[in-house]
Amino acid sequence: MKVGTDGLLLGAWASLPTYVSLNGCAVTKDSAAYLDIGSGSGLISLMLAQRAPQATIRAIELDSDAARQAEHNFRQSSFASRLQLLKGDILTYQPAERYALIVSNPPFFDNALLGSNGKRNQARHTASLPLPLLLAKAAELLAPGGSLALVLPEPAAEAFSQLAGAQGWFAMASCQVFSRADKAPLRRLMQWQRVPCQPRQQQLLIHNDDGSYSEQYRHLLRDFYLKF
């Protein structure tokens, strides 16, 4: 299975809900349902299934090849009974239930950066899932008390934050990701909800000066990498 750093970070970093309200009843994180939008190979869904041992995770993916790969990965995992792959467009998805947590590693290239590879464009380009529509759909699908977690490149993250605030979202947590201490931040991990809160501000360093993984990075991913 292809493993990307963005997905690894989001799957390990996102805060799991302690409880949400479904039909007037409090539901704990271990019995709630989570949604992975644009799941790709299914990495984030698998990580969430490991972290929340009884939660149900649904992954929705538009690309047929990626959906088949995710479905294969789900079947091969020990969490298969709690993972479901949905092939389709999130914008037309109308489930009966609402989700305690929605995660997404969304497309992020601007129009000017479109290439000739249609599948690559779809996977990594904002035209396939405009961020305003992602926010609107997440608001529709979240249970009361639920949250949206995602990862974006640093420049896009700032614009997204302004957009989210204008649409009535509140930042729960934000984490700037640095490849090295002497470099500008590459990514920002963010988690948002629909009620006011005091946001946590964090920073994460991936590599030490000698190129080895930082202790902070190892600690975050130690439950997923045997070598850590």
Map each language-model feature to its residues.
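Residue-level signal for inorganic ion chemistry
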Residues: 10, 105, 134, 192
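Conserved SAM/SAH cofactor-binding pocket of Class I
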Residues: 12-97, 101-104, 110-118
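Short, structured loop/turn "capping" segments at alpha-beta junctions
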Residues: 110-113, 145, 170-172, 199
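Mobile active-site "lid"/loop adjacent to the S-adenosyl-L-methionine
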Residues: 106-133, 137
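Conserved SAM-binding loop and adjacent beta-strand
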Residues: 1-16
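Conserved Class I SAM-dependent methyltransferase catalytic core
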Residues: 3, 129-185
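SAM/dcSAM-binding transferase cores
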Residues: 182-228
